[in-house]
Amino acid sequence: TNDFMRF
């Protein structure tokens, strides 16, 4: 999973 743009 991609947690780069997790806000």
Curated annotation (Swiss-Prot):
- A GO biological process held by the record: neuropeptide signaling pathway
Family assignment from sequence similarity: Belongs to the FARP (FMRFamide related peptide) family.
Instruction: Give its localization.
Output: Secreted
Protein name in UniProt: FMRFamide-13
Organism equals Sarcophaga bullata (Grey flesh fly)
Give the main location.
Answer: secreted
Keywords associated with the record: Amidation, Neuropeptide, Secreted
Question: Phenylalanine amide: which positions carry it?
Answer: 7
A GO CC term assigned to this protein in UniProt: extracellular region
